[in-house]
Design a protein with these regions (language model features):
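Intrinsically disordered, low-complexity regions enriched in Ser/Pro/Gly/Gln/His and often acidic
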Residues: 40, 59, 137, 184-186, ...
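Acidic, low-complexity intrinsically disordered regions
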Residues: 43, 62, 140, 187-189, ...
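Charge-dense, extended regions
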Residues: 165-267
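Short linear interaction motif-like sites in intrinsically disordered regions of transcription factors
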Residues: 48, 67, 145, 192-194, ...
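Short, isolated positions within intrinsically disordered regulatory regions of eukaryotic proteins
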Residues: 51, 70, 148, 195-197, ...
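Extended alpha-helical scaffolding regions
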Residues: 46-133
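Glycine-rich hexapeptide-repeat left-handed beta-helix
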Residues: 1-79
Length: 267
């Protein structure tokens, strides 16, 4: 999200979900701020509902997961960047410099917090969708990318390119079939990536029952913290007069119902 007059085209891919605020000649970066906004929460739920294409006539493959190996990979990098900045400059400085951006001390601390909340939400959500067993494939363990809404491992993107060059993929029909095949395997590819991520994050050697319960507990704590931050943002919008009281109350009621999904198993 950008505010003010930006004098150039910033590249903030390594610090996703951030605010950019131009003030005179200074570009302030607020990392991860958009993770806790009403706007993001609504978008997460709005875009899948707006896809009115008939199930049998969807020419484009669009994956609506807002937290995926693609976005979470960037969040991991963003969190590491912020931690490295803090390590290099110390915790008592008023601002940090990252390329051409200025990050306030409080913004950096909150950015690390918000990114960590997102990571824990992602890990818990994945465990709700897949049994905690060792992956059956190595596809997906590397970096991920996005092709017009199709989320896929970079290795699969490269395989598409190689097969087009070799003639294995000759027509647009062949290409669409490959896209659909990759999308059909998304859950397993995602699990291959997520399994390793969970082990690395927690320092586990395997996903024992005790370890799984710890991840799930952290997921619930993080999700409630996320909802609490969104409530704060909604209250701010209401105080500024941006929304009517009835809309504000209905939105809060919707957020209160989020606890119903905490322990829901989806596999």
């Amino acid at each position: 999200v950008c505010f003010g007059k930006l004098m150039y085209h910033p590249d903030t891919r390594s610090l996703p979900f951030s605010y950019l605020i131009a003030y005179n000649d200074v570009m302030y970066l607020v990392p991860g701020r958009n993770l806790t906004t009403v706007g993001l929460y609504r978008d997460i739920r709005k875009w899948p509902k707006r896809d009115k294409r008939p199930a049998g006539a969807r020419k484009s493959v669009v994956n609506f997961d807002w937290l995926s190996p693609f976005t979470v990979g960037e969040i991991l990098r963003g969190k590491k960047i912020l931690e490295d900045l803090r390590e290099a400059s110390g915790e008592d400085v008023s601002t940090y410099n990252y390329h051409e951006y200025v990050i306030k001390n409080s913004s950096l601390r909150k950015g690390i917090k918000y990114y960590d909340i997102a990571l824990r939400i992602y890990m818990g959500a994945v465990l709700k969708r897949h049994a905690p067993v060792e992956p059956t494939t190595t596809v997906g363990t590397g970096p991920w990318t996005d092709i017009s809404g199709l989320l896929l491992p970079v290795s699969e993107e490269q395989r598409i390119i190689d097969d087009i060059i070799s003639g294995e993929i000759e027509t647009t029909h062949d290409l669409i079939e490959r896209f659909e095949e990759i999308n059909a395997n998304y859950s397993e590819y995602r699990w291959a990536w997520s399994y390793r991520m969970i082990l690395d994050y927690y320092g586990f050697t395997s996903l024992t029952e005790e370890n799984v319960e710890r991840v799930k507990s952290d997921y619930i704590t993080a999700r409630r913290a996320w909802i609490a931050e969104i409530k704060k943002d909604a209250a701010k919008e209401f105080r500024l007069g941006d929304v009517e009281e009835e809309v504000f109350r209905n939105f809060n009621d919707q957020l209160d119902k989020e606890v119903d999904f905490e322990n829901q198993k989806l596999y």
